[in-house]
Amino acid sequence: MATRIIVSYDDTDNDRDALALGRLLAFSGADLSLAYVRHSQGGALEEKEAEDLLARGAESVGAPEMPRHVVVNPGTSVGLAELAEREGADVIVFGSEYRTAPGTVKPGIPAHKLLLGGPAAIAVAPAALRDNPSVSINTIGVIDEGDPAARETAESLGAALGATVAERAGAGHIDFLVVGSRPESPAGKVTLSAASDYAVETASFPVLVVPRGRPVEFAPLAPASPSDPDESAGPAEPAIA
């Protein structure tokens, strides 16, 4: 089964960064969908506005058929957590907080709440990632917190994207970071240590925090067939759930 990724999207610039990161991860063969959390039931007009908002996001990346979810919940983080559990999602992707300087990472309130006990891996995009369409993942760093799930996730993503996994955090340049949950975190839940929280908030590249004991298994790229007329075409287009 393909990895399932949900992008939290509300048509702001920072959530366009989240969509850019989701698309980047989807080159691994993952299934991608968009989600918007409405905080009240409202009426037919509000429902249509939410659906139109998500449709614009899907169309902006040339994927009008991308699955979209409108969730009604007073809390964005709760609504997304419930959606992830219902859909069997592996990753929820966020943009950084709206006042974040370009090229840096700062989780907003919903992302931060899910970094304190969420049921799925949490990815956060640097601000203005949307403005760098040529960005790629070539070298992946790992902070494992004593949990092999972080390195297993990094190795799986590296295999899928043809990227290298650094031997240790801080060992030279990286352009993506995978972080494990702290040792006392309940199995299957995301919880950052103070040191890892600092690493996330001082990062200048996308970050993925994985639940304790539950690696994200990205699909490896299929080897090119000898008869393929264009073996140099690069990764296939991201999958749509």
Task: Tell me what each language-model feature is.
Residues 19, 23-25, 81, 155:
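A structural alpha-helix within SAM-dependent methyltransferase catalytic domains
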Residues 70-79:
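Charged docking surfaces used in two-component/phosphorelay signaling
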Residues 100-101, 185-187:
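Short glycine-rich, flexible loops that bind phosphorylated cofactors or substrates
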Residues 49-53, 106-111, 190-196:
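Charged helix-capping and loop-helix junction motifs
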Residues 1-17, 90-102, 106-107, 112-155, ...:
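Intrinsically disordered or low-complexity boundary/linker segments at protein termini
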Residues 87, 172:
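Active-site charged/polar residues at nucleotide-handling catalytic sites that mediate phosphoryl
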Residues 24-58, 167-171, 215-241:
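Acidic, proline/glycine-rich short linear motifs
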